[in-house]
């Protein structure tokens, strides 16, 4: 059996389990925020061979329908300070933050400090495998302060991060 068929089986099993998890958590409404950094507003248009052709808004609507027992919010900014402000704003009241800081992942000590300053756990996600790209993308200031890291699985990375909070 090749790796791609094993991955498909694994993703199907994750989807099945995620539906069970969503059902079990229907009694408690969790608050999970997805925060996207620079250029992620261009998903669906920007480098579709790397990031896919679906917009994040389309994907987010699907997540909301699939996980009705979770209060999902979405925020995107191309501005570092606005991302920090959002982390500060929700970082003491939400159950989890799913953060794709985009290129700020590799440059922003300030975002890492904001994550350390709040109590809400943060999961770092990336659509592409940053380690298979340019060498400057191999360093993350977010990973050392995040609960975990999921990357390289396309938009599914966000759903897997969401499942980990349930």
Report residues per predicted region.
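Short, glycine-/small-residue-rich phosphate/pyrophosphate-handling segment
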Residues: 132-166
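Short, acidic/small-residue loops that bind anionic groups at enzyme active sites
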Residues: 117-132
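Short Gly/Thr/Asp-enriched flexible loops that form oxyanion-binding sites at enzyme active sites
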Residues: 108-117
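Glycine- and acidic-residue-enriched helix-capping/strand-helix junction motifs
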Residues: 43-57
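Short beta->alpha junction loops
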Residues: 73-81
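Short acidic/histidine-rich motifs immediately flanking catalytic phosphotransfer sites
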Residues: 90-97
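Extreme N-terminal starter segment of soluble prokaryotic enzymes
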Residues: 29-32
């Amino acid at each position: 059996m090749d790796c791609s068929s094993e991955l498909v089986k694994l993703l199907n099993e994750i989807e099945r389990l995620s539906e069970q998890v969503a059902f079990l958590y229907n009694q408690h409404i969790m608050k999970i925020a997805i925060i996207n950094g620079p250029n992620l507003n261009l998903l669906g248009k920007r480098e579709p061979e790397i990031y896919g052709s679906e917009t994040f808004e389309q994907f987010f609507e699907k997540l909301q329908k699939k996980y009705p027992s979770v209060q999902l919010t979405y925020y995107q900014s191309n501005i570092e300070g606005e991302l920090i402000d959002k982390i500060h704003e929700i970082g003491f009241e939400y159950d989890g933050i799913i953060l794709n800081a985009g290129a700020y992942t590799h440059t922003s000590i300030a975002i890492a400090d904001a994550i350390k300053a709040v109590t809400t756990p943060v999961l770092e996600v990336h659509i592409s495998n940053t380690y298979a790209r340019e060498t400057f993308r191999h360093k993350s200031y977010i990973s050392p302060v995040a609960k975990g890291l999921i990357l390289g699985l396309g938009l599914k990375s966000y759903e897997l991060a969401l499942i980990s909070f349930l």
